[in-house]
Amino acid sequence: MSSPWIFISPSSRGIGHALTRHLLRTTSLPILASTRSSDPASTKSSLLKDLPQAEDIAPRLSIVQIDVTDESSVAAAADRARELFPSKTHHLRLACAIPGMLFPEKNPKQIDMEKALQTFQVNTLGPLVLMKHFAEMLPKQSVELEPSPKDDQLQLSNSHALWLNMAARVGSTSDNRAGGWYSYRASKAGVISLSKSLDRYLAARNGEKALAMAYHPGTVKTGLSKDFWDSVEDGKLFSPEDAAAKMASVMAGLKVDQRGKCWDWKNEEVLP
């Protein structure tokens, strides 16, 4: 029987930071989390700060350094994952690829090619390179999955693993009613597309043992959305902690017939 582990990239701030802390509190699974920082110990300390029984939790949290625009760092992190979680005894039960950045152009004249390229490198190619090096650690069809511990507050599926890529509602072409945000919209549309492609690959290779999805978290009170907090309607601006809890609930409840699609924090489908 294969033992589960969790991968969150990145985890040093925003939703990734809150999600890692949430999963440390609500599951007993080992977690591999990433940071761009050259001081992983500082990231680990931040993730554990003020958590109940932090000293007991600390051994199951490992930190790797990843810059998604530098494939060599992703490859090195994947090598470390294989050392910590050998494929003969372990499988990747939950992976969250959530790098993101935003340059909100209002019209074509504001498009800066260097910033647009950076947006695609982080938002679209970031999850893509994480998929390249980590998706093979998801369980194959023949693998018998060890159940989630019954005492865990968050019960991940015992029948399948899940790969999540962070998308956004503005990545929906069919829902594009306002225009603008050219590079960000296109980069997130790409995330929805590559999530579907990954799921098709997993369906052929892993059967129902591994699924992929894209996710829209709503507007979250992070540095990425800071300039737009005042324009969000009441009750729709989420703290990172609230967003993480909603995200975990959607992930834990995802069914096989929901695979390959983009879902939001209300567990409603976001059409491409």
Regions found by a protein language model. Give the residues of each.
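N-terminal Rossmann NAD(P)H-binding glycine-rich loop of SDR-like oxidoreductase domains
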Residues: 8-12, 16-21
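Rossmann-fold scaffold of SDR-type NAD(P)-dependent oxidoreductases
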Residues: 9, 88-102, 123, 165, ...
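Conserved glycine-rich Rossmann-like NAD(P)H-binding loop of the short-chain dehydrogenase/reductase
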Residues: 24-46
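Rossmann-fold cofactor-recognition segment
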Residues: 50-72
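Conserved Rossmann-fold cofactor-binding substructure of NAD(P)-dependent oxidoreductases
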Residues: 67-90
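Catalytic loop of short-chain dehydrogenase/reductase
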Residues: 100-102, 107-120, 125, 135-206
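Short beta-loop-alpha junction of Rossmann-like oxidoreductase domains
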Residues: 174, 216-229
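C-terminal helical subdomain
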Residues: 214, 227-272
